[in-house]
Amino acid sequence: MRRRRAAVGVLGLSLALLTGCTASVAGVPDAEVVRPSILPRADDLPRTGQCTDGALGVVDCAQPHEGEVVGVGQFTGMGGAHPGERDLRRQALPACRAAMAGYLGSGDHDATRLQARVLWPSLDGWARGDRWRLCTVVELAPDGQRRKRTGPVKDLLKAAGFAQVQLCAQRSPAEEADPGITACDGPHLAEAVPGVLDLGEPGEPTPSGEQVDARAGEHCATAVAGYVGARRQDVFASWRAFGSQAWSEGYTTVVCYAEATRPFTGRLWGLGTQDLPA
């Protein structure tokens, strides 16, 4: 995971390169793959728009549920032998992430506590010819643990719904491998902002750190200034990008953060030139 920071309004001055790269960082939403012990056939799977419990049973989305189906598809071109988890992830996750963005109404889901959850057949199911893949979206609690959700997520990110599931961090996204997600209405140091930057396609070469920074720096500084409503010296634009393995699985984005110089309680959204909250 590549991490950088720049002061909003003084982009390019005193940028410190921060080392460290991982495919998955604890405390940051990432995809989850589930190999169920049950063996449903494709005809028995829940449909797009339905909500499910832990056993893939359909439940009313107005009631507490584990996930919401955003897409159902088939693995193709993999032959009869089980291909292994990495190859399955590389085919399933890009399609599921695209379906998730369309279902939520925005590609900004990487800046939220919503995460893709992918299910596929067990080894026995694969051996009997099952090739289905089920894409669902689940929600993380502010402590980073998955929790049951009440209410549908269809088109949630089209408008004010972003704030309901926004990622906020206890520690610096620019400096910490695990910034520690937390509730946005409590003390925090940084807020993920709308305007996730898509760098390319998973089949393309992974961009270098310098290429990521060249595109992310100006983009994130602009996104943070628009989010805050002013360019300030006490709020920085931070950004985080995924590593090469995650890139091959569809994680081709950069998430921008509005990072303050000290912890605060409240929101930076629309703060303008007012004092940083206590």
Residue ranges and their predicted role:
Residues 1-13:
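N-terminal export and membrane-targeting signals
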Residues 17-20:
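C-terminal motif of bacterial Sec signal peptides marking the signal peptidase cleavage site
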